[in-house]
């Protein structure tokens, strides 16, 4: 099964994970410790960035910092 990654697991991230889990294995990264939900694997940022799709769903105040951080990774 193809993997989709979500950075940020707040309200919007949870809704997105629920929708994606119907067709993808969903990996989630959040700076806060979060519990595993059914159909979601809590992972490191490295593991999420290995996914074929990655969604950034963080608060707007954190968006720029997250983009700068993931820009240092080698992505597809």
What are the residue ranges of the model-derived segments?
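Short, Lys/Arg-enriched, disordered terminal segments
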Residues: 1-3, 45
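Short N-terminal micro-motifs specific to bacterial/archaeal maturation
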Residues: 3, 38-39, 50, 54
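Conserved N-terminal Rossmann-fold NAD(P)-binding element of oxidoreductases
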Residues: 4-8
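Hydrophobic/small residue at the entry helix of a nucleotide-binding pocket
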Residues: 12
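NAD(P)-binding Rossmann-fold cofactor-contacting core
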Residues: 19-38
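Active-site regions of enzymes building and remodeling cell-envelope glycoconjugates
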Residues: 36-45, 74-76
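Rossmann-like NAD(P)-binding element
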Residues: 45-74
């Amino acid at each position: 099964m193809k993997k989709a990654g979500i950075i940020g697991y707040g309200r919007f991230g949870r809704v997105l994970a629920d929708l994606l889990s119907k067709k993808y294995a969903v990996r989630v990264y959040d700076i806060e410790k979060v519990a595993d939900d059914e159909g979601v694997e809590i992972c490191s940022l490295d593991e999420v960035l290995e996914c074929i799709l990655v969604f950034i769903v963080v608060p707007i105040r954190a968006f720029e910092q997250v983009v700068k951080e993931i820009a240092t990774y080698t992505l597809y």
